[in-house]
């Protein structure tokens, strides 16, 4: 049995300890935020935040995050009460297919929490390990910058 | 079969008081040929809408108004991430004078929506926004509602106006009646009237406005249901085991190798299709990795290094697009003849999320949740794969990861269907990254020869274009599941390839942009092209491919445009002409001329020949280049200026600024259009700078994001400025593939402007740039 704390709730799951966290989140808990993009930690689609760090849940065994507070995209905000990042993405219409958005927002969240007033270059650097194959780069980077200003207020 | 409606559809129909099936069955509709958006599909696959499709000529196939006034529209064009659902909703709201959020749009479900072939090829706007289909059904409905209101209120229709679903007398606001009251929950029972008057763009209040996409909030908060998130009761998980080499076949499968693994339900083998079903996805993956399959050796692959030469030597199926028959003679008379060869690699869709589908096959019936671009074609081909009747297959579109054309969507749907059939339970399959990338239907590689003759004044007097491109498989269409890997492994053949000489062109068709913009395009005497060069030939050779191929955003159009627009630039440079002025000298289409002029103005284009005077041969050099196109010969005008910085020591190319001008007829949603222009431009940049499928002597080696090189989200992103020419009086055209078509050409031209080195092979890797710099005169 593995105990996972996700978005403030505790779940006890019967899992092989080697199971990647992503599988527990999207299949056992049926969360829709974290996604399987590559299974290799290369694209970011599966990103969640653990202890303030954006981690790739597709290559993180559940055992290694047992008991730690895990935040997913669902945990940031809701449609009615979106997080400033989510709000900025809606306002800037910063998505196309939307599959990458989880990785983009979660990576940006962990980054902005540590770097409240980043420059454009710092944001680009922080987002250089995340992919968006629809190439919504312009809007997403702009939304991150605006959300950063909002969050720093 | 019991149709499975999604919640929204079910509640809408419940409110309306009938089932959709009953609704259409009892409509008494006369089924006649009607254009449901078949332009590309007919050319490619022949035939018309599938049996069982709601008839496109009936208003009820597109629109239902319930007694409570709620409006549901049905479309065969689906949301793939480009905002087409939003603009279709805008269209319906506009034509029926409703607020945007009063319209519910349902798309691509074979139990509910009309067959409009594939959602592809920038055809959704042409199909549903001009004088037929969804737009015209709404216009017909509006006229019918006004007629009913006129009778009910005793006031002539021209003295009535509509707003918020209520028709009111212009002279007396108390005299009014709602749509719901007028129809009383009944059907329209009306044939779509192609002469029904559309609302003029000057009166638009919803269409043409930057309405935000309703799917953004659920997407960014993790509430949106992708096909990856579909969960059915009792659902199991499948993984496929693909061959280790191209052409390898199954010799034996040792099922005992996984029988002790936890959760394994079944090993499934059908000819060369191999898969595993387990209780949980992680268990399925373990089992697929451990399953012992003995494969025959692969067929062997042509050398990657010499591939373009190999392609030229293959037997070909030829397509002659235009031939004035005097090209050789005119080239002989020319003062100067220039030649160049342009090369484009196979590239992949490389969807962000690997493809996924969920199938529930019970006996001779199947319900399938698929990200396919063609639910009706998936219905007939999945039926073939399963060996059941198409009537018994219900396909429901659910959004996948952005596809940009034929990614793994269709193939993974067959995977899920086959595995579900084997276990009699719902099965979800998501491909591994490698299975997605090694076996998808790649965008075509191209070899393109350009030859042109100039007179003493530097005018182009003759131009010859000849291309070679390999092909294998394609979209499955209505009857060819073997066009993608799973169908083939399961025993179906792809479209046969037969070499044949070219026939004389029968009409002007520039669907692949094989004909340069500067050709007169005189097929059968009348010039239909966009240019002035009368001595012209464009010939395409299609050859057999060792890899699966299929449409990738701007298929063939991007490759051909890269060659044509790069070569035009070479001609301009040769005669020391300004590239914009030289284009304008050889163009005659006023709308294409307009986008070229507008983009030059917006970019503050400096009129002078390339290369840029004063640039040094070392260090960083800046330059600008342009390209233009009438996409598919009739589907959107676009011109693009690229400004680049080239590090001549490292060979690194950085795009600094893109300025794009688009004319797509009436603009449905300016913000959505800008999103497409921006995304297309950057995807084009990624494809121009880094993307290339690679292989060894047995197998594809570009199988993940370390071996297939895409630009990440964070890089030195160029500024993108879009100029939209709104032409409400013209027909609506596509817009998703215009900017991407121009990037490689404009970028290559800008690199030449900066450095004097001409790049004729995609991708422009630092090594290739350095080689071109070293080869400068």
What function would you assign to each model-found segment?
Chain A
Residues 1-153:
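Signature of N-terminal electron-transfer/Fe-S-associated modules in redox systems
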